[in-house]
Amino acid sequence: MTGLVLAGYFAGYEINQLVPVHATVNLIGALWAAATVLTVYKDQRVESQKSFFATITAALLGSLIAVAYLLWLPQHVWGLAPIIVLAMLLSQVLGFADRGRQMVSMLLIIVIFSHISKNSPWVNAGMRDLEVFIGALVGLIGGYVGEQLPGLDDT
């Protein structure tokens, strides 16, 4: 498991080096990819596959909500609060109740990154989605390997 998390971290770091947006954001983005590995990886291939698609969907929805907020609403604590509630409600309505926290996490990290880096919300959202995809892919591959090699998550 440690190897998978490190693979996600280094892959996330390297992808951020290809598109150098901001040094701090790049490092946090690598950590975001590593954390995503932990979310997606399961001992069984089928469970990892389900987790992969749910994670990608939640990340994309969270990104879209974040971009809409950043482009069209005032940047204020009282402007963000209803958006968080909206994201949680949307996750319930769409049947992603177990991924609502992930949607909100994605929303918040994009808002935070948009305050650190003055790039377009689209760039920040795109990079965060790419980091999630990388981490999710590593977790998915780990699930396939983990099914063949029991005890992978013991390391």
Model regions and ranges:
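Alpha-helical transmembrane segments and their membrane-interface boundaries
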Residues: 1-105, 112-155
